[in-house]
């Protein structure tokens, strides 16, 4: 399944969960629970267990009941149970990411991710954030990431928009021109 098709299917699910959380006044709590569950199900041993066809759905459900039901809200527990019953727990990270986007939109928050090859000073980060503020009246939440693989330059994610001014991107473009003649 293509990523765009997958997101088109999962977005209504994330929206429905968000709507329930909003109605209950539990937006942050349900996000935190879903996020923790998502991390839990990324564990290799847990993943193997839940995708093992020789283990019955009943046994998987009992494990969820025993371990997660006591620590999750009934809404999050019900959702995780449904995903487990339908062997769809692997989509939880995607749903959590979509939920976060919906929650950010609802709360008027713009997420900015700044990726550089080496650590940048606070003044540079502040200049980038001030530039973003010129285009958005929303609250800005940002993170900086060092990724030596980009070689140099900068990549800035503003919401779902990517501005890639990395050396790696320039090299990839040159390689593409030489390879395909575009």
From Swiss-Prot:
UniProt cross-references to Pfam families, sorted A to Z: OSCP
Gene3D superfamilies on file: N-terminal domain of the delta subunit of the F1F0-ATP synthase (1.10.520.20)
Q: Which domain of life is it from?
A: Bacteria
Gene Ontology molecular functions: proton-transporting ATP synthase activity, rotational mechanism
Q: Which UniProt keywords apply?
A: ATP synthesis, Cell inner membrane, Cell membrane, CF(1), Hydrogen ion transport, Ion transport, Membrane, Transport
Any idea where this protein resides?
Cell inner membrane
Under the heading PANTHER family, the entry gives: ATP SYNTHASE DELTA CHAIN (PTHR11910)
NCBIfam families per the UniProt record, alphabetical: ATP_synt_delta
Instruction: State the HAMAP family in the record.
Output: ATP_synth_delta_bact
Q: What does this protein do?
A: F(1)F(0) ATP synthase produces ATP from ADP in the presence of a proton or sodium gradient. F-type ATPases consist of two structural domains, F(1) containing the extramembraneous catalytic core and F(0) containing the membrane proton channel, linked together by a central stalk and a peripheral stalk. During catalysis, ATP synthesis in the catalytic domain of F(1) is coupled via a rotary mechanism of the central stalk subunits to proton translocation. This protein is part of the stalk that links CF(0) to CF(1). It either transmits conformational changes from CF(0) to CF(1) or is implicated in proton conduction.
Q: Subunit arrangement?
A: F-type ATPases have 2 components, F(1) - the catalytic core - and F(0) - the membrane proton channel. F(1) has five subunits: alpha(3), beta(3), gamma(1), delta(1), epsilon(1). F(0) has three main subunits: a(1), b(2) and c(10-14). The alpha and beta chains form an alternating ring which encloses part of the gamma chain. F(1) is attached to F(0) by a central stalk formed by the gamma and epsilon chains, while a peripheral stalk is formed by the delta and b chains.
State the name under which the record lists this protein. ATP synthase subunit delta 1
- Organism of provenance: Brachyspira hyodysenteriae (strain ATCC 49526 / WA1)
Give the classification, highest ranks. Answer: Bacteria, Pseudomonadati, Spirochaetota, Spirochaetia, Brachyspirales
